[in-house]
Structures are given as C-alpha cells and as structure tokens.
Amino acid sequence: MFKWIANLLKPVPDKIEEQLLSNFDFLLNNYNFIYCKVKLGNAVDKNGKFFFYGPLNAYQFYNENVCINILHLVQRDDYNVYITDQKSVNQVYIRNGTEISSELAYNFSLFAEEVKQAVLKHSEWNGYKF
C-alpha cells in the first residue's frame, strides 16, 4: 500500500487528545501506561440513567493498577475525571470511581503536574499506586 494511502487511514488526534498526550507523556514514557480514546455514545449517570446526548469521549491512561478516565461531553465541552482500578468502557463503573475536582479536570497541565509530583514523591496519587 502506498504510504500516503496508509496515512489517510490513520486516525488523526483531536486537539484535546494532543494536549493530553503532551501533558501526560511522562506516564507513557516512565510508568508503562497505555493510552486510548473511546467513544462512549450518550452520557449516563452513576446509576446508568440517561444523562445527556453524546458524543461522550473517554481519554484513558492506564496500567495494571490504575486508570485515569477523562470524560469529555463534546456538545457541552464539559469534562469530568474519574480514577478507577482498571480500564473500562462501562460508564457506570467509570463514574463510580474517584472523582477529581473540576479545577483539575479543566486544567490539563495543572492536573498532569499534580499527578507527576505526587508520583515522584510517593509513587502513588489519591491512593492509587503507579
């Protein structure tokens, strides 16, 4: 296959994805985290009831101990961040994880720096081992 055709078929990262990958690159490079973006459809609440029409994207950084789930409700440009024990595409499971303050959810660089400093000093953040 021609290289330019292969490049056309590759997914193009969105602006949010680029910011996240830039800010959280230390997790990928130093702590063997894996990154993925998942489209979750319509948003549901902690009880599984309809909350808002999608699209709802989950940007996830995870390893065998922890998953940082950054949920983005695209139409409203709202963010919520939840920490769970493992990666999942189940919104109820994600939303029942540890919720991170909106101050950090809307400021990726501050969020990444807080995680980085905690991990460097204690090898954990919010009770989750890295």
List where the protein language model places each region.
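Intrinsically disordered, low-complexity regulatory regions enriched in serine/threonine/proline
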Residues: F2-F26, Y31-F130
